């Protein structure tokens, strides 16, 4: 179902979040073709005062302006750097201090793109906002549902699970019905400057720089020992914050006597002892979990969990739907999976689905081992 076009008698004003990328550029074009009164808004969420050349905000703003000039719409600019620091980045640092691996893009969507931006757009007189996210929405029975994007390779519902239905109801997602090649073709057809611009990667405020170099600017390193599951010390790490469950690269382990040639993986981050526990093999049993616990779930719309419910879930972006049973417990929520789940990582998010409907999700706090013999 495509996002609704306005009736001829009611020209709705829509402000598109223009990132300087091809998806938001095409979103603006599509909305204009549907008859909306379209304007753009470029958000600056990070101050470029860290002495590096990595931040691309100036280039992105120039690209957004070029697109708006080409299609003949006004471009507003807004600085949400203070809100980003207070509501996203400080939480990001606290999570790393606690040894978890957070996903700031999820919090950015909830606090900045669908809160600060939405509020600002409404203040400017907009009826709706729009973004270039690959998701869809559906209005049914007095509520607005968040649906997966039709392109399974680009679906971004995982990152929008913490946005409430009321915010989704005020947002249009023009490219959610399209596949990426179609989006680029539309951009080429209209001669947009962003038509061949590559997709952004990594966390927005880090850009293309090395993550460990960035994190060291804000958090002191806390070196410790790297141990096997048997307790043998085989190396040293520069800080648990620089590692995540299932990580293979960058461990600096090699040439050990009596060890096989199988690669080493991070199995456990022992926060109490500041130790990194590693093991060999992509299918090491310690890498697999049967259940996870989250104390709080953000629902797009409230759901009934008076009894356990069969759903599907993702514990990382682009993962296939994993069948599970979700139940409410005294301390929060517990999801038990039908099949073993690899590298379930505290700090990351679990997102629940009912078919194509994204129901919501929360931060993973505990990953329960798959086998009872696993004494993590």
UniProtKB/Swiss-Prot annotation:
Pfam hit, one: tRNA_Me_trans_M
GO-annotated cellular components: cytoplasm
Residues the record marks as site: Interaction with tRNA: 133, 348
Record keyword Acetylation present: no
EC numbers on record: 2.8.1.13
Region (Interaction with tRNA): 154-156, 316-317
MF term (GO), any: ATP binding
Gene3D superfamilies hit by this protein: Adenine nucleotide alpha hydrolases-like domains, HUPs, Translation factors
Cysteines joined through disulfide linkages: 108-204
Keywords: ATP-binding, Cytoplasm, Disulfide bond, Nucleotide-binding, RNA-binding, Transferase, tRNA processing, tRNA-binding
Location in or out of the cell: Cytoplasm
Record-listed ATP binding positions: 17-24, 43, 132
Active site per the UniProt annotation: 108, 204
Catalytic activity: S-sulfanyl-L-cysteinyl-[protein] + uridine(34) in tRNA + AH2 + ATP = 2-thiouridine(34) in tRNA + L-cysteinyl-[protein] + A + AMP + diphosphate + H(+)
Top-rank lineage group of the source organism: Bacteria
Region (Interaction with target base in tRNA): 103-105
Keyword presence, rRNA-binding: no
UniProt record, GO biological process: tRNA wobble position uridine thiolation
Role noted for this protein: Catalyzes the 2-thiolation of uridine at the wobble position (U34) of tRNA, leading to the formation of s(2)U34.
Family assignment from sequence similarity: Belongs to the MnmA/TRMU family.
Alphabetized HAMAP family for the sequence: tRNA_thiouridyl_MnmA
Name used for this protein in its record: tRNA-specific 2-thiouridylase MnmA
Organism: Pseudomonas savastanoi pv. phaseolicola (strain 1448A / Race 6)
